[in-house]
């Protein structure tokens, strides 16, 4: 049985494919997750994350951008965007504790992105979580 960490990794892969221009991924997300042995509760969890990000993608991007400082969101790599979007969605719209989300995103950055990416992800998501702690979305 897959773990939540594995489910998040699979969601990042789906978001990466979507960001890379594969809009068909929305239609086949469930079957792709099942191919990765993401089933039952973890499948529902992964699909809720994937669909949640896509439903609120513009809002999520707007949440991330002020925390980028000297970076332009459009110039970020697709994998960095995928991980940041997942993290920002979970921080803003799910009950999962922020330190868990940030740690998971750092680990995903180590697995999928460039060597400096985990520090970058940590800085952005930590800043976002502190802002939302002061002024929650809901």
Swiss-Prot record:
Signal sequence segment: none
Record-linked InterPro entries: NusB-like_sf, NusB_fam, NusB_RsmB_TIM44
GO cellular component terms listed in the entry, alphabetical order: cytosol
Keywords in alphabetical order: RNA-binding, Transcription, Transcription antitermination, Transcription regulation
Gene Ontology MF terms in the entry: RNA binding
An example Gene Ontology biological process: DNA-templated transcription termination
Its job: Involved in transcription antitermination. Required for transcription of ribosomal RNA (rRNA) genes. Binds specifically to the boxA antiterminator sequence of the ribosomal RNA (rrn) operons.
Annotated family: Belongs to the NusB family.
Name of the featured protein: Transcription antitermination protein NusB
Source organism (scientific name): Helicobacter pylori (strain G27)
């Amino acid at each position: 049985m897959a773990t939540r960490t594995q489910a998040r990794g699979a969601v990042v892969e789906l978001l990466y494919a979507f960001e890379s221009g594969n809009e068909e991924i929305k239609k086949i997300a469930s079957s792709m997750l099942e191919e990765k042995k993401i089933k039952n509760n973890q499948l529902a969890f992964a699909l809720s994350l994937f669909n949640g990000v896509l439903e609120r993608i513009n809002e999520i991007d707007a949440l991330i951008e002020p925390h980028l400082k000297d970076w332009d969101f459009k110039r970020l790599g697709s994998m960095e965007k995928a991980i940041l979007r997942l993290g920002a969605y979970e921080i803003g719209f799910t009950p999962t504790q922020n330190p868990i989300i940030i740690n998971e995103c750092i680990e995903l950055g180590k697995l999928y992105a460039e060597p400096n990416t985990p520090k970058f992800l940590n800085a952005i998501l930590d800043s976002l979580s502190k802002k939302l702690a002061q002024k929650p979305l809901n």
